[in-house]
From Swiss-Prot:
It comes from Corynebacterium efficiens (strain DSM 44549 / YS-314 / AJ 12310 / JCM 11189 / NBRC 100395). Na(+) binds at residues 95, 98. GO terms for cellular component: plasma membrane. One of its GO terms (biological process) is cellular detoxification of fluoride. It catalyses: fluoride(in) = fluoride(out). It is a multi-pass membrane protein. This is Fluoride-specific ion channel FluC. It comes from the Bacteria. Keywords: Cell membrane, Ion channel, Ion transport, Membrane, Metal-binding, Sodium, Transmembrane, Transmembrane helix, Transport. Its main location: membrane. GO terms for molecular function: fluoride channel activity; metal ion binding. Pfam families: CRCB (PF02537). The keyword GTP-binding does not apply. The keyword Transmembrane helix applies.
Length: 138
């Protein structure tokens, strides 16, 4: 998608523009891909909202303890490996669905040996889930 923006003076915050060939107007065409990046960012944000709502629904159903968070993170990791989704589904929906910050917050409330064990189990199982999903997709 190409967007025309008025070019009145050089502005360092906008990408460089060039006039359309032969029309002589003071409008330019954005060459840097600004709009596709904007739409991609908006789609990632919308996807993250969807994923966070799905995670909230599951945590309301199953609780916010250590094991539901681990199951959510493993499921999200498996789906990432299985489908290798693009920005909306991958970074957005599954990024909002998985909750690595929440498992870090939960670790503050448990004794250190349990926290280290849970951290290890989470990282190893999520990597294993991604590898299993990736292998299944091949």
């Amino acid at each position: 998608m190409q967007v025309s923006i008025p070019v009145c003076y050089p502005c360092p915050s906008f990408p460089q523009t060039r006039p359309f060939a032969g029309d002589g107007r003071k409008f330019g065409r954005v060459d840097s891909g600004f709009m596709p990046k904007l739409w991609e960012g908006l789609s990632v944000g919308a996807g993250a909202a969807v994923g966070a709502c799905a995670r909230l629904a599951l945590t309301m159903q199953f609780g916010e303890g250590l094991w539901p968070i681990l199951a959510i993170n493993m499921l999200g990791s498996f789906l990432m490996g299985r489908y290798r989704p693009g920005p909306f589904w991958g970074t957005g929906v599954l990024g909002g669905f998985t909750t690595f910050s929440a498992f870090a917050v939960v670790l503050v409330d448990v004794p250190l040996p349990h926290a280290v064990a849970y951290l290890t189990v989470t990282v190893v199982s999520c990597v294993a889930a991604w590898l299993m999903g990736n292998r299944w997709s091949a």
